[in-house]
Amino acid sequence: NGALYAKMPYDMVKDFAPITLLATTPNMLVVHNDVPAKNLKDFIALGKKEGKMTFASSGSGTSIHVSGELFKTMTGIDMVHIPYKGRATAIPDLLGGRVTMMFDNMPSSLQLVREGKLRALGVTSSQRSPAAPDIPTIAESGLAGFEAVSWFALFAPANTPKAVVDRINALVN
C-alpha cells in the first residue's frame, strides 16, 4: 500500500490499469463478551472514561488496521494497535479478552457473533448488511461519516491494451 509504505517496488497508479471492482465486504467491530458496553455509543463512552484500549488487527496496513485507526481518530479514544500475523492469531486473544476489540471482515467473524462468542457493535459499510440486518452500521450508531470496507478489484499491467482491459471488464461484469 503506497499510502502506508514509502518504498514500494511498484507505483500503484502508474504501473497498473484498473479493470473492474469485483466485490466489497464490510468490516465489523467486534468485542469480547466481558466488555460491558452493549452498543457503540456506550463503547465510545467506556473508551473515553477508561483511557487506553487495545485493538487487534490481522496486520499493519490491512483494511482491518485502517478501520481501527479511523475509529481511533474519529472517536478520540486512546487506543493501542496490536498487529498480529493474520486473523488466526488475533482472534484467540480477542476471545480471551487480551485485546479489547477488533475490526474484522464481517464474513470471518459473523459465525462467532452468532454463536455468542463475540459481540458485534456495528458494521463499517454505509448500509446494514443483508447477511446481518440486525447489526447497525457504525454511522447510524452515532459516528456519522464512518465507512471502511474491504474491496477486491481486478487490475492489469499498465501497458495492457485498452481493448483487452475493456474486454475483460465486459466478461466480468
Language model features: what each stretch is:
Residues 1, 58, 87, 104-109, ...:
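Beta->alpha turn/N-cap motifs
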Residues 3-89, 138, 151-173:
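Hinge/capping helix and adjacent helix->loop/strand transition within the periplasmic-binding protein
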Residues 5-11, 34, 111-123:
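Extracytoplasmic "Venus flytrap"/periplasmic binding protein-like
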Residues 6-13, 127-145:
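Small-residue (glycine/proline)-centered packing/hinge motifs flanked by hydrophobic/aromatic residues
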Residues 17, 43, 117-130, 147:
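Conserved helix-loop-beta element of the AMP-binding
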Residues 39, 83, 97-98, 105, ...:
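Conserved functional loop/turn residues at catalytic and ligand-binding sites
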Residues 50-53, 75-77, 95-104, 117-120:
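Alpha-to-beta junction loops
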Residues 70, 74, 88-98, 107-115:
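Short helices/loops that flank or line small-molecule/ion binding pockets
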